């Protein structure tokens, strides 16, 4: 008895069929195969089979539409893309250059275009570890002698210390250059005063406290800055030495010596009278807990009127190469707050200005408390003052001394001494002359 094939149900004889029945079954099989393959018959040269319906073996011969297919020749190089200039109109978009990104562009023929990837804002807060790196903050005054000859002395621009055995002046100057500088308004001028003959090294630098240094341990860093020289700069071969120094101690001053000192970057820059940017890289040791950056040169002969160098846009970042300059913070207010952590000055007004109200007098002066707007690095270690007086309801009394008593990083208690006051009167601290101030230091 005939059976059928599993896929097309074609009848086939079985092993039990009689000979005559087998022949009949074979004939039926042939007819079934012929009927199933009828759609494969015919066609002309170049035609291809196309499904007519979803039914099995239901085909139709059709002419190939190669002309409307996307041809291989439309692309010419690795990375080419196929786009369109209109409906049903494919077109080639040539590969871009390394680093470019594909963007929508309605002005382009294909509506697409290659463009340089945005690097984002160049002003990235926190990237640069150097505080007051464009020399905007000068609480101590924008010009002054800086003959500090020991650690912790000779500060002028906030956070920047100076050292020279002779007499030098550090001052804020307008850069006056928007061609070679990225619109930085100010720089520091470090000047060997005219007539000086001391050949000792002149230093200008900044120490990082340990809290801000540890993040650099084991990292590759890029150190960059802008600098130029004065017409009488006496450094040999117009060279300005520079260093990024690391240590393993805690909150030390580099002039006193870092414990475990190393110099991941130590080289020199050749200055001209035009602003240039200098960039250097190095690797901070993995056990580093403190950092400093500084510039130095040895004066030669007798200093002329313009024996100085100027520097600005100083940047230390964790990077394999220097990026565009960015200050530590994004606003002057934030940069000032960062500097107040180390030095807090009150007063400095022209004429009479009140510094502190609501004190209570005794016959020898008063005890006064100052609250800091920003927590200092540590409790202040020194107090500075000038042209102060204590005034009560009837008189003013010149201040003879100000001493720290009980201090914390948030508050300074001071004893303000004078003579001749009447006890238990309300009094206030103000000026006896132009330039009155009181300042608290927690510098390294």
Indicate where each model-derived feature is located.
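Extracellular and organelle-lumenal recognition/adhesion modules and their flexible linkers in secreted
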Residues: 117-444
């Amino acid at each position: 008895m005939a059976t059928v094939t599993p896929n097309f149900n074609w009848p086939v004889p079985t092993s039990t069929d009689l000979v005559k029945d087998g022949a009949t079954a074979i004939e039926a099989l042939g007819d079934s195969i012929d009927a199933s393959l009828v759609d494969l018959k015919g066609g002309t040269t170049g035609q291809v089979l196309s499904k007519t319906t979803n039914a099995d073996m239901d085909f139709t011969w059709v002419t190939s539409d190669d002309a409307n297919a996307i041809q291989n020749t439309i692309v010419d190089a690795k990375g080419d893309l196929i786009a369109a200039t209109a409906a049903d109109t494919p077109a080639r978009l040539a590969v871009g250059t390394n680093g470019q990104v594909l963007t929508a562009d309605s002005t382009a023929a294909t509506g697409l275009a290659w463009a340089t990837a945005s690097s984002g804002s160049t002003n990235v807060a926190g990237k640069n570890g150097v505080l007051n790196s464009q020399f905007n903050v000068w609480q101590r005054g924008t010009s002054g002698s800086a003959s500090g000859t020991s650690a912790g002395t000779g500060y002028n621009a906030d956070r920047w210390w100076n050292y020279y055995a002779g007499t030098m002046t550090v001052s804020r100057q307008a850069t006056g250059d928007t061609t070679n500088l990225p619109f930085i308004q100010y720089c520091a001028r470090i000047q060997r005063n005219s007539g000086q003959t001391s050949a000792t090294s002149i230093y200008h630098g900044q120490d990082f406290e340990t809290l801000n240094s540890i993040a650099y341990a084991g990292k590759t860093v890029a150190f960059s800055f802008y600098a130029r020289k004065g017409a009488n700069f006496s450094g040999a071969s117009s060279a300005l030495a520079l260093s990024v120094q690391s240590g393993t101690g805690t909150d030390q001053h580099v002039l006193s010596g870092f414990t475990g000192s190393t110099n991941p970057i130590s080289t020199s820059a050749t200055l001209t009278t035009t602003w240039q940017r200098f960039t250097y890289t190095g690797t901070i040791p993995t056990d580093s807990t403190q950092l400093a950056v500084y510039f130095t040169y040895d004066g030669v002969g007798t200093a002329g009127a313009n024996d100085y160098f100027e520097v600005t846009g100083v940047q230390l970042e964790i990077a394999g190469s220097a990026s565009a300059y960015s200050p530590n913070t994004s606003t002057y207010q934030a940069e000032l707050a960062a500097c107040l952590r180390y030095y807090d000055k009150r007063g400095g007004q022209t004429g009479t200005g009140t510094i502190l109200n609501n004190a209570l007098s005794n016959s020898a002066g008063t005890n006064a408390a100052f609250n800091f707007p920003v927590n200092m690095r540590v409790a202040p270690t020194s107090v500075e003052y000038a042209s102060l007086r204590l005034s009560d309801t009837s008189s003013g009394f010149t201040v003879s001394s100000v001493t720290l008593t009980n201090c914390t990083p948030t508050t300074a208690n001071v004893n303000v001494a004078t003579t001749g006051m009447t006890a238990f009167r309300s009094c206030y601290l103000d000026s006896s002359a132009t330039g009155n101030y009181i300042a608290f230091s927690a510098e390294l």
